[in-house]
């Protein structure tokens, strides 16, 4: 049980992410647009909406509402849409973060990927971010991969304590498997290990 307790503890710690993460996420989305995978206007459409003590961050449409951003020119998906949603307290505490991609492969089969850090507000949910049966089967920070986000078995793969920026980098590295979107090239990893 100790590894699962430790994992949950690290998931709680990432909620204290610096407020600068929103600018870094925007930079990753701009890089996606610059590579021709989404509309260039995305640079100004990932923004927060004030909700009193909170800000809701998402990719916004022309009318200001949340949208799933269409993606283009992906080698393994014929169609895809990306969504990013976050709830941040004015103190900087990250209450919730979700990034998802839903689309179709060239053969018409559906495909989805999502990373979730559930809302931890106990006023919103008595158990906060403790969902499911436990920290193993439903780790606080987890990902889904499958034909959609609902088809059983609804597998939740536990993720290490990654910041919102690192989660965005991971998702983009799955969508655009190129050097430009790989934040930890093996040559860099080996060099970092050698320096230790």
Where are these regions (language model features)?
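Hydrophobic-cavity lipid-handling domains and compact docking modules
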Residues: 51-113
């Amino acid at each position: 049980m100790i590894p699962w307790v430790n994992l949950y503890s690290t998931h709680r710690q990432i909620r204290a992410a610096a407020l600068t993460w929103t600018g870094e996420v925007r930079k990753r989305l701009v890089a996606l647009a610059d590579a021709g995978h989404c509309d260039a206007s995305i640079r100004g459409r990932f923004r927060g909406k004030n909700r009193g003590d909170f800000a809701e961050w998402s990719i916004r449409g022309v009318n200001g509402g949340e949208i799933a951003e269409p993606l283009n020119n992906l080698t393994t998906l014929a169609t895809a849409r990306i969504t990013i949603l976050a709830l941040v307290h004015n103190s900087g505490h990250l209450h919730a973060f979700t990034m998802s991609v839903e689309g179709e492969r060239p053969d018409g089969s559906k495909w989805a990927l999502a990373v979730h850090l559930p809302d931890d507000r106990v006023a919103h949910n008595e158990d906060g971010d403790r969902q499911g049966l436990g920290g193993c089967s439903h780790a606080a920070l987890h990902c889904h991969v499958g034909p959609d986000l609902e088809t059983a078995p609804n597998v939740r793969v536990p993720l290490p304590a990654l910041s919102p920026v690192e989660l965005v980098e991971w998702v983009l590295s799955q969508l655009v498997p190129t050097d430009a979107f790989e934040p930890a090239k093996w040559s860099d990893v080996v060099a970092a290990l050698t320096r230790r």
